[in-house]
């Protein structure tokens, strides 16, 4: 019988600065060549468990350990020793780069081992080809897209022929199409190298796009389930801990189709439905289509637009490339609109132009009918709240309370009102128990929620959020989005830049689709998410509802997608 490559026995860990353990009584065996998904909500202990595997715990982040952990049959002795077994790809790939070029970054570990240059070049090229990164070895890592950066990071750890590849939230910063390619790449690496793959991620459905042996579900530092995908996707434990079930599972459940392990529901392409069950889905979609036939997709155009972008163009001086070309659209009070498209499509550049971080080269941006060209950044900030994609680029105070209070204090708000506002917004963002914590103690996803709180606490008329749910588990995702919905119902215009097609489908009535600096489409969200041609052009990915419609022989997949978009299927 094969011995475990990784084995936790009655393992618990407590950070020295914390009162209670972060991990409790972990008993887990992982065998050579397995592909494992570790899933759980924010704060469940996923990242801490990963840090135990790569040696950051206890050698960098010290604490109290009980029980045992062996890797390769040995007790970890140092980070250096573990690096021979475990290669880690961080969630924030920028924090991992050390070389001036991508090739130099991949070669870093070999340089430290004084590897002969000819051998080094050959090995760098081989591993770059393995991950599909051989076309940009001379490029600076900082100039690459999110997906390209991830490939360079993978190559940098695979070059040491490690037995274990550990990936911390590999999908967090990727557009849907690139995320799909990342999962395919990880699957390809597993097949070609035979290494053990451990993925830490809460986006269950996206990871299960390709084969996974087991899913380890964590909550409050404990393993609550260790199951195969066919069992985990229908487990009530997902609802209990706050992890989203796959969209097609939720749809089938609401329609009244009984999904069991025997139907092989772990992946949509393995799902086995009877003819009667497929007919049930078709009849439901038809009924939902009839019920919504009189509904209008028009948004309110009876008032002056709150924000109007007119023929806007922008070129980055250092590259002389057109980041945006002839962009025009209107936003009306109370709209909730998504901006979608590939990495590098111009979505974030547009947001920077609206808030004044960059100046338009052509065209104009109007707020309530008035050109904002002469407004300063602080003046624009009084009208439009902005939440960046990377929280580390926004946070400037060491303590959470002071960080969220900063915008209020510079505006002269009284301390009692500051306390009241902060308590309310931290509660909504799921951060109330961290009120007096230092920022440094938070996870990446928790920092993201702090920056959303920074914007929400000022009660702006427009909120622009760049990837508002990146790094969030389903429970916090839902809390944040429902809070945005409540603001939206009060007339606050919400503009969301997102890669999350579930978010677009569930919360956006309208979607602006960008590709290569152009606005390809301005349509209802359900139309965008049921148009494979448009999805391919913009590096999007149709939701699993589209594929479910195809499996059930629904002629017009939009009927099922629209039903979900309009609330016919519960989230």
Q: Model regions: which residues?
A:
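Conserved ABC transporter NBD signature motif
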Residues: 62-77, 363-371, 380
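Conserved beta-strand-loop-alpha-helix hinge in the C-terminal portion
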Residues: 222-248, 518-545
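Catalytic Walker B motif of ABC-type/P-loop ATPase nucleotide-binding domains
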Residues: 165-168, 463-466
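Helix-to-loop junction immediately C-terminal to a conserved catalytic motif
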Residues: 54, 355
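ABC ATPase NBD coupling module
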Residues: 74-87, 372-385
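Conserved ABC ATPase "signature" region
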Residues: 118-136, 405, 416-434
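Conserved ABC ATPase signature
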Residues: 140-144, 148, 438-442
